[in-house]
Structure formats: C-alpha cells, structure tokens
C-alpha cells in the first residue's frame, strides 16, 4: 500500500528538547543568539526583505520550542486543504508523519495529538526519537497501545557503551529494549550516523544483523558532517574538533555494501539509494536510452550546481548537449539546497555565460544573486532551476520507473529554462 504522507511538525529545540545533545549533533554548536542576524534568504524573499515565512520555517524555527497542539492541528488542517485543492486527498491513502526538530517523545502533548489522528483512523508515524527519553519499557508500551503504526528510531549502535558515550543516553539498555519491542510490534525505521573510528563497518554490520532478526523495515546511514561545505551553514565551527569525515564516494560505497548484504531497505544521506541507482538514475550507462526523450538544447547557459551533483550532471550533459552550449560550474558546497551567498562569491565570473541557471532551492535571495553575478559589470540573466533534479523517496513509495519519470520531468523543466 502506497501512502501520501503529510508531515505534521511539532517544533522543539534540538538538544534542549532531546534530553541533551548527542556529541555528533549538527545543532550542538549553533549560536542561537546570532541566528536572527544570518544573511540567509531564499527565492521567496521579497526584494527588500532578507527573510520570509519559507526560509524562517526552514532555518530559524529550530529555536522556537514546541508548538501548542492547536497550532500543530491548524497547520495539519491547512495541509489537508492544500492536498484537497491539488486533488491528492484520499483518506484511505493518507499517513501522518508526526515530526520534530527535537525528540518527538518529549513533546508534552504527544498523547493528545496521537489520539486526534487515530480518531480520524489515520496511520501515524512518529518521525524521530533517539530513545533517550525511554527509561523503561512502559513508555514504549504506551506508544504502541495508542495505535502508533510506525516509528523512526536513531539507534546509532547496538553497543550500549557507544550510545552512552556518543548519544549521552543515560539508560542505553532500556532504549535498546524499547527498540526491540517496537520492532516486534510495529514498523520501525532505524538510523545511524557514520563517524570514522566510531561507527565503522563492523559496527554497522553487527547493528544491521540484530535489526534484521528483530524485523526492521528500513535503515538509514547518515554521513557525519563536520565542515561548512558539507552543510554546516548555521555555524562556523566543526561539530567535533579534529574529526575527519568520509568522502562522498567512500560513503556511497559503504551504503552499497550494506544494501547488498541485507534484505530490508537501506539508504544513505546525502542521497544514496543503491537499489534504485540514486542519485541521478539517468546518468548511468544502462539508462542512457531515457535521455533520448529529452528535448534538444538550443541556448547557451551556465548551470550552477553542487559538488555532489556536478559529476552526474556532466555525464548527462555530455550526451544531451551535443553542441556544448552549457557549461557546468560547481561550488564547494556538497548539497545544492544549502548553497548560500558565500559560495557564490568564490565563483570565477569569467567562466559564467550570459544566462545562469541556479538551483531552485539555493538559500540566496534573487536580488543577492543578481548583485553577485553582475558585479563584474555584465548584466547576466539569472534563472532558478527546478527545486529537485533527482527525486529522493526515503520511504520507498515510488518504484524505479516512477523515479526515472520524476528525473525526466525535472530535466525537461531545466532544459526549458535553459532555452527560454
């Protein structure tokens, strides 16, 4: 059964509402006092305004604490209305993902919220818990008895000592007992953070072997990020001083090895879904035939992208751009949606053509983009590309053909904007 999932965010402050920061938490060294003065904007910001509702909700809401249930339900009903307007609303296929910037089990009105959704007979997924707030099995039993259908659990490691040291879990054995109970009773998605010399290959395989016996649904490996180009845009300090990280290639190879070993769904973040050849399915040689469906390129442009996406895009454009009308420039930032004005200042404008296609989700105001790309006196045309070029379906609701069609649709939009 494929569900349409509606995210219902209850807010919460990372770390503060998690039972303490994990040692590897991205938010651990964010200076919340200066967050309001950050120069991050987005495509939706008005010309004379640095911040709008959209980028506030994405960046600065992390310091706003938990929302009252009335606000959560109001936003949920608004989302239902939008789904109805778009023609997507069908209660039979609807699932609610109750999520938080912190640990969802610390939300003081959780029981009330779950009861509301269950009265509507909706499946409920609790979007994230570290398990640190579970001090005995009764807490897990209560969650199950309320009718929760699915839970996402940050296991980190099956070694209680590692959970205690790196997650600051005061009762790691109880957390793992609760995880076992969840796995035996409802659907469970687990996650770990891959940290060199801490969570290594042997630890991951041991954790996955136990979880397979328990009946896990999905396992997510997140690469530990410790540097600004990896996405630390809200602070200038590493999360853990002196700690190295895996390269993207090494990380993706690790995810592939784990996926080949186990039968449950395994994905990696940043985007890696080995079973579906993600990211950028259509860049692979065995799917080259699909590129024939794309329209021709007939205009010159520079395509700005991220360090991670650039190699895949170059492979695709080598095939579809026969006249070499488009050059691809990447900044050092690994994820396009986290590109900020600082990344643009590092670009050599001599390599930039008259028309520039910028990632749709880049965290820069359009007015800033114009100033930065035209500071050499050239009046360039700045166009936003699609929000996503390679759709990433975390919960596995789309088959490979649907994912390919999603990529082709995004690239048709991209080529249309290149040609306009």
Where do the PLM segments sit?
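Conserved strand-turn element in the central/C-terminal portion of the radical SAM core barrel
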Residues: 160, 178-203, 225-226
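Catalytic cores of alpha/beta
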Residues: 137-141, 196-214
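Active-site beta-loop-alpha junctions enriched in small/polar residues
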Residues: 101-103, 129-133, 156-158, 193-197, ...
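Hydrophobic faces of well-ordered beta-strands that scaffold small-molecule active sites
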Residues: 5-10, 94-100, 124-128, 149-153, ...
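Surface-exposed amphipathic alpha-helices with a cationic face
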Residues: 80, 111-121, 144, 179-184, ...
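Core AdoMet radical
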Residues: 29-107, 113, 117-135, 143-175
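Flexible, acidic/Gly-rich N-terminal and inter-domain linker regions that tether
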Residues: 1-55, 372-378
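Auxiliary Fe-S-binding modules of radical SAM enzymes
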Residues: 205, 212-420
């Amino acid at each position: 059964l494929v569900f349409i999932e509606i995210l219902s965010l209850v807010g919460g402050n990372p770390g503060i509402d998690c039972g303490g920061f994990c040692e590897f938490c991205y938010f651990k060294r964010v200076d919340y006092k200066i967050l309001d003065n950050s120069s991050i904007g987005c495509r939706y910001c008005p010309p004379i305004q640095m911040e709008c509702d959209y980028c506030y909700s994405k960046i600065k809401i992390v310091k706003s604490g938990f929302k009252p249930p009335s606000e959560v339900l109001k936003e949920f009903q608004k989302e239902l209305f939008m789904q109805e307007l778009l023609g997507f609303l069908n209660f039979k296929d609807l699932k609610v993902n109750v999520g938080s910037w912190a640990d969802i089990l610390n939300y003081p009105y959780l029981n009330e919220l779950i009861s509301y959704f269950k009265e509507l007979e909706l499946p409920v997924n609790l979007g994230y818990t570290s398990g640190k707030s579970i001090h005995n099995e009764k807490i897990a039993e209560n969650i199950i008895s309320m009718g929760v259908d699915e839970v996402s659990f940050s296991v980190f490691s099956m070694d209680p000592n590692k959970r205690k040291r790196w997650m600051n879990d005061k009762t790691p054995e109880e957390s793992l007992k609760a995880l076992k109970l969840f796995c035996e009773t409802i659907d469970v998605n687990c996650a770990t953070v891959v940290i060199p010399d801490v969570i290594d290959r042997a630890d991951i395989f041991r954790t996955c072997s136990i979880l397979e016996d328990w009946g896990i649904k999905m396992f997510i490996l997140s690469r530990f990020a410790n540097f600004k180009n990896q996405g630390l845009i809200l602070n200038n300090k590493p999360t853990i001083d002196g700690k190295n990280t895996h390269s993207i290639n090494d990380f993706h190879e690790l995810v592939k090895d784990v996926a080949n070993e186990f039968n449950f769904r395994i994905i990696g973040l940043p985007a890696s879904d080995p079973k579906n050849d993600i990211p950028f399915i259509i860049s692979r040689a065995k799917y080259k035939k699909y590129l024939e469906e794309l329209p021709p390129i007939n205009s010159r442009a520079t395509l700005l992208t991220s360090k991670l996406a650039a190699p895949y895009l170059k492979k695709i454009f080598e095939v579809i751009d026969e006249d070499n009308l488009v050059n691809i420039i990447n900044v050092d930032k690994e994820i396009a949606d986290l590109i900020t004005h600082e990344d643009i200042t590092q670009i050599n404008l001599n390599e930039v053509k008259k028309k520039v296609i910028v990632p749709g989700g880049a965290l820069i105001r359009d007015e800033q983009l114009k100033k930065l790309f035209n500071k050499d006196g050239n009046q360039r045309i700045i166009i936003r590309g699609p929000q996503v070029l390679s759709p990433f379906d975390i919960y596995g609701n789309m088959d490979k053909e649907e994912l390919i069609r999603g990529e082709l649709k995004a690239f048709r939009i991209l080529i249309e904007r290149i040609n306009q």
